[in-house]
Amino acid sequence: MANLQERLTDIIRPAVEALEFELWGVEFIRAGKFSTLRVYIDHPEGISVDNCADVSYQVSSLLDVEDPINVEYNLEVSSPGMERPFFNAQQMQPYINETVAFELVAAQKNKRKFKAELIAVEGEELTLAVDNDTLQVNMRDVKNAHLVPAFD
């Protein structure tokens, strides 16, 4: 059986796409009594508070019926924002030559958390420039990654 995040993504995606938004990603954070389901949506024209409210209403109704989560949780719907988290390698493709913050499952070259310039994305393989060195990382080895906005 798929893990909870994959199951939630499969349940939520059709509702988000029916409202003509892209499902950027889903996070379920367990924190004792205060678990949170975070749904990130995107659209080429941006995301408004009303868009988030519409998606929240649809997703909430759907999850009430499907009931995939067996603990109390808060539902949050938002855009990925300027520090957008990356849930898969394909999402990184438009951000080549940008700075991305990474947290790896296990250290590579004595680094587990670092910022790097994204040089290339080929399938699940990422090529990164870190401290005047090049690092190859497979997306399955990435625990978390998010864009680091440049303020020029």
From Swiss-Prot:
<dbReference type="Pfam" id="PF02576">
    <property type="entry name" value="RimP_N"/>
</dbReference>
<dbReference type="Pfam" id="PF17384">
    <property type="entry name" value="DUF150_C"/>
</dbReference>
<dbReference type="InterPro" id="IPR003728">
    <property type="entry name" value="Ribosome_maturation_RimP"/>
</dbReference>
<dbReference type="GO" id="GO:0000028">
    <property type="term" value="P:ribosomal small subunit assembly"/>
</dbReference>
<dbReference type="InterPro" id="IPR028989">
    <property type="entry name" value="RimP_N"/>
</dbReference>
<dbReference type="GO" id="GO:0005829">
    <property type="term" value="C:cytosol"/>
</dbReference>
<dbReference type="InterPro" id="IPR035956">
    <property type="entry name" value="RimP_N_sf"/>
</dbReference>
<dbReference type="InterPro" id="IPR028998">
    <property type="entry name" value="RimP_C"/>
</dbReference>
<protein>
    <recommendedName>
        <fullName>Ribosome maturation factor RimP</fullName>
    </recommendedName>
</protein>
<keyword id="KW-0690">Ribosome biogenesis</keyword>
<comment type="function">
    <text>Required for maturation of 30S ribosomal subunits.</text>
</comment>
<dbReference type="GO" id="GO:0006412">
    <property type="term" value="P:translation"/>
</dbReference>
<comment type="similarity">
    <text>Belongs to the RimP family.</text>
</comment>
<keyword id="KW-0963">Cytoplasm</keyword>
<dbReference type="InterPro" id="IPR036847">
    <property type="entry name" value="RimP_C_sf"/>
</dbReference>
